[in-house]
């Protein structure tokens, strides 16, 4: 505090810059993290980066049926949705405490 009860603007600015740096580091860490989603009891598995990029899809041969492609398609979509949910949880865990200190910064779900 400065004389007269006014906040020290340089200290507030330094604190905001530090919080911004921490948030940027957490966002980069999140983008480079990997999560796994699955469907059909693990018959279809998806690996996704925190950025949302799908990096691998593994399909158990037991679920491949040329006469029932729709089931396989549904399982792939389900596994991707599960991985996306895991990214959301990870983002909330890593970014939530930081963004909360900055008023949420308009980040959905935080």
Swiss-Prot record:
Predominant location category: cytoplasm
MF terms in GO: DNA binding
Annotated localization: Cytoplasm, Nucleoid
GO cellular component terms listed in the entry, alphabetical order: bacterial nucleoid; cytosol
SUPFAM superfamilies membership: YbaB-like (SSF82607)
Domain of life of the organism encoding this protein: Bacteria
Pfam family, any one: YbaB_DNA_bd
Keyword Membrane: no
Keywords assigned by UniProt, alphabetized: Cytoplasm, DNA-binding
Family (UniProt): Belongs to the YbaB/EbfC family.
Quaternary structure, from the entry: Homodimer.
Role: Binds to DNA and alters its conformation. May be involved in regulation of gene expression, nucleoid organization and DNA protection.
Protein name (database record): Nucleoid-associated protein Mkms_4993
Species of origin: Mycobacterium sp. (strain KMS)
């Amino acid at each position: 505090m400065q004389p007269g009860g006014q906040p020290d603007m340089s200290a507030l600015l330094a604190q905001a810059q530090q919080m911004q740096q921490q948030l940027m580091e957490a966002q980069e860490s999140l983008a480079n993290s990997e999560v796994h989603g699955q469907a059909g009891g693990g018959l279809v598995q998806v690996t996704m980066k925190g950025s949302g990029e799908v990096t691998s899809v593994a399909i158990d041969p037991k679920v491949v049926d040329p006469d029932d492609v729709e089931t396989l398609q549904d399982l792939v979509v389900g596994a991707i949705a599960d991985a996306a949910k895991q990214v959301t949880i990870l983002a909330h865990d890593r970014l939530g405490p930081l963004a909360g200190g900055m008023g949420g910064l308009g980040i959905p779900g935080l």
